[in-house]
């Protein structure tokens, strides 16, 4: 059991520990938190997939729950300050795109679940020299939205190229795009940069906002519910 949530009720114990107890899982079930901002859910899928492939576990569950209420209320109160500078207003504005939601997924071996959709793995790159562009606490998130968009798209392009090479993706390989979503500008520019058809991407940012690590699994679930994902389709999970 891996919890990938950004939000948490306590520093200790881990949120995974609480979920494990609430579900009354077997004491032998390994449980831990994994934090990596909006990428954590997909990272956790890689970890579970790798452990299954190595024969260390038979199956694993990933959970994520995000609540934006506390930081949104704190930000709105801060932005009411008449002494707030224009720069301070702008660096707080991205916080207002945050949403709330939760998701979970279970991964198992193809031997035990021969008819289930297959997770094929992926690719990852880091540009940690830009890690100061978005700094968040329970009370405040400070974001340089312009630079974050520029450097984020740059990294996305590099990572997509690596994934395409590793997984054999061509321009029309993917039937559905499951995107981590922040805004219309971000979604449109990402698809334009990668040469992807925006009609293949179900948009949830108008109603859900940026739900952090839960965004990708929520989009995937809603795409399946809407009949956009059918047996045999190739689906790209882009964090």
Model-derived features: positions:
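A glycine- and small-aliphatic-rich helix-loop capping segment at beta-alpha/alpha-beta transitions
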Residues: 15-26, 49-54, 75-86, 196, ...
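Short coil/turn connectors at secondary-structure junctions
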Residues: 26-30, 54-60, 92-93, 101-102, ...
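Flexible, glycine-rich active-site loops centered on histidine and acidic residues
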Residues: 53-96
């Amino acid at each position: 059991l891996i919890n990938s949530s950004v939000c948490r009720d306590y520093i200790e114990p881990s949120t995974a520990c609480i979920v494990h107890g609430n579900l009354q899982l077997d004491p032998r079930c390994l449980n831990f938190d994994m934090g990596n901002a909006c990428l954590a859910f997909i990272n956790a899928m890689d970890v579970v997939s790798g452990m299954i492939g190595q024969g260390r576990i038979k199956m694993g569950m990933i959970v994520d729950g995000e609540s934006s209420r506390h930081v949104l209320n704190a930000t709105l109160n801060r932005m009411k300050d008449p002494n707030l500078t224009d720069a301070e207003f702008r660096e707080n504005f991205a916080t207002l795109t945050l949403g709330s939601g939760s998701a979970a997924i279970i991964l198992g071996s193809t031997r035990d679940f021969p008819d289930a959709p297959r997770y094929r793995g992926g690719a990852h790159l880091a540009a940690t020299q830009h890690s100061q562009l978005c700094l968040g606490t329970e009370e405040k998130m400070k974001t340089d939205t312009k630079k974050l968009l520029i450097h984020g798209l740059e990294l996305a392009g590099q990572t997509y190229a690596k994934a395409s090479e590793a997984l054999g993706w061509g321009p029309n390989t993917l039937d559905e795009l499951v995107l981590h979503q922040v805004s219309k500008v971000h979604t449109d520019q990402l698809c334009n940069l990668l040469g992807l058809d925006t009609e293949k991407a179900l948009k949830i940012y108008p109603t859900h906002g940026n739900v952090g690590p839960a965004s990708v699994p929520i989009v995937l679930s809603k795409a399946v519910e809407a009949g956009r994902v059918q047996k045999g389709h190739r689906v790209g999970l882009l964090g």
